C-alpha cells in the first residue's frame, strides 16, 4: 500500500478498536470480522463498487450514504460503522479498500480472541499451522493449487482443522486460504505476528536442532525479555541440520548458538 492507503488503514483501525472497546464483546468482534470478510467477497467481484466507494469526486458523506444503502441491515452495526469509516477515507487505489477491509476483519477477530483471553493461544495455533503447512508439502500444494476453487480449498482445510483449534484461528485460517494471491504459509505466519504485536510482544524467531518444550520456550522468552527489555513471543521451528543448539532472530539481529554455526566459524578461522 502507498502512503495514502496506509494512513487510511491506520485511521480506520483506530476507529475499529474504538467501536469494539465499549463492551469488549467476543460475539460483536467476531461477527464484525466475519461480516467484513463477506463484504470483501462482494468487492472482489465488483470493480465498479470498489471505484464508487473510493471515488474522490464524491464527498465522504455521499460514500458513507452509499454504504448504508447497500449494506445497512445486512451486516452487524460495528461492521457497518467500519465500512462507512473506510468509505470516508482516502485510498490510493480502489483495490486497496478491499485489502484494507481484510486487515480490519482479521483485526476484529483477533480482538475477539483478546476479549476472550485466548489471543496468545490463537497466536500459537496460527504459527503452528504455518509450520504444519511448511512440512506437509502435499497439503500445501493442494491449498496453493490455482486451478482449485477457493471453496474447495477452504473445505479441505476446514476438514483438517475442525475441532482442533479455536474458532478464531479456524476463521482466520479459512479466510487466508481463500485468498489465492497469497502464500498461505507466509500469510498464516504473518497473522501470528500480528497477534503477538496486539499483545505488545516482540517476536523472537527461534530455529533449534530439536523441538522445544513449553518450559524451555517460557524460559527462553523470559531470558530474551530481560535482554531486550520487553515481552517476547517465541516462534520456534526445528532444523536438524543445525546439529545442536539454536539460532535466534529478533528483528535484524541474529544470535547463532547452533553447533553448525560454531563449526562454520571455526572453519573460517582456520582457513
UniProtKB/Swiss-Prot annotation:
Pfam families in UniProt: OSCP (PF00213)
GO molecular function: proton-transporting ATP synthase activity, rotational mechanism
A GO CC annotation given for this chain: plasma membrane
UniProt keyword annotation of Cell membrane present: yes
Source superkingdom: Bacteria
Record membrane topology: Peripheral membrane protein
Predominant location: membrane
Subcellular location(s) per record: Cell membrane
Family: Belongs to the ATPase delta chain family.
Biological role stated in the UniProt entry: F(1)F(0) ATP synthase produces ATP from ADP in the presence of a proton or sodium gradient. F-type ATPases consist of two structural domains, F(1) containing the extramembraneous catalytic core and F(0) containing the membrane proton channel, linked together by a central stalk and a peripheral stalk. During catalysis, ATP synthesis in the catalytic domain of F(1) is coupled via a rotary mechanism of the central stalk subunits to proton translocation.
HAMAP family given in the database record: ATP_synth_delta_bact
Name of this protein: ATP synthase subunit delta
Organism listed in the record: Corynebacterium aurimucosum (strain ATCC 700975 / DSM 44827 / CIP 107346 / CN-1)
Lineage, opening ranks: Bacteria, Bacillati, Actinomycetota, Actinomycetes, Mycobacteriales
Amino acid at each position: 500500500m502507498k502512503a495514502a492507503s496506509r494512513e487510511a488503514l491506520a485511521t480506520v483501525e483506530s476507529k475499529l478498536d474504538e467501536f469494539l472497546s465499549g463492551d469488549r464483546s467476543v460475539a460483536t468482534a467476531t461477527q464484525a470480522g466475519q461480516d467484513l470478510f463477506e463484504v470483501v467477497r462482494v468487492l472482489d467481484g465488483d470493480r465498479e463498487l470498489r471505484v464508487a466507494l473510493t471515488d474522490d469526486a464524491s464527498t465522504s458523506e455521499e460514500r458513507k450514504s452509499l454504504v448504508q444503502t447497500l449494506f445497512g441491515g445486512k451486516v452487524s452495526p460495528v461492521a457497518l460503522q467500519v465500512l462507512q469509516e473506510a468509505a470516508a477515507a482516502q485510498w490510493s487505489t480502489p483495490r486497496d479498500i478491499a485489502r484494507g477491509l481484510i486487515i480490519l476483519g482479521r483485526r476484529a477477530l483477533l480482538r475477539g480472541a483478546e476479549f476472550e483471553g485466548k489471543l496468545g493461544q490463537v497466536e500459537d495455533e496460527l504459527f503452528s499451522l504455518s509450520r504444519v503447512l511448511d512440512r506437509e508439502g502435499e497439503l500445501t500444494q493442494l491449498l496453493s493449487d490455482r486451478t482449485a476453487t477457493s471453496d474447495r480449498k477452504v473445505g479441505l482445510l476446514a476438514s483438517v482443522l475442525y475441532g482442533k483449534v479455536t474458532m478464531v484461528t479456524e476463521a482466520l485460517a479459512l479466510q487466508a486460504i481463500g485468498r489465492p494471491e497469497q502464500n498461505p504459509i507466509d500469510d498464516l505466519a504473518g497473522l501470528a505476528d500480528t497477534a503477538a504485536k496486539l499483545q505488545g510482544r516482540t517476536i523472537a524467531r527461534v530455529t533449534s536442532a530439536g523441538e522445544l518444550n513449553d518450559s524451555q520456550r517460557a524460559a527462553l522468552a523470559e531470558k530474551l525479555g530481560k535482554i531486550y527489555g520487553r515481552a517476547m513471543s517465541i516462534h520456534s521451528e526445528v532444523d536438524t541440520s543445525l546439529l545442536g543448539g539454536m539460532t535466534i532472530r529478533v528483528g535484524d539481529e541474529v544470535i547463532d548458538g547452533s553447533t553448525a554455526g560454531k563449526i562454520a566459524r571455526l572453519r573460517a578461522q582456520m582457513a
